[in-house]
Amino acid sequence: MKVSKIDVESVAEYLRLDDYEEEQIIPLITAAKAFIHSFTGLTDEEIDEHEDFYIVVMILCQDMHDNRVLYPDKNNLNRVVDTILGMHRKNLL
């Protein structure tokens, strides 16, 4: 599945949420996509070319949903996410 096709229902299903509001899920999707953009330097079109980014969005959404704390540990990026994003990274700084 392409990242541009990810919707609130698919994320809620992945998170196994029975009772949810769109206002809770939309910021997670937006933040996950922004993280991919800033980490890789890829455009929306380039991101859609790689279907492995679908799982990255889902994992990031789950991580943000499960770890809603005031001071997150910034040095603790999921290995799967780090590996997939690293494979497609354009900005190597």
Enumerate the language-model features and the residues they cover.
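Divalent metal-cofactor coordination and adjacent catalytic microenvironments
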Residues: 1-93
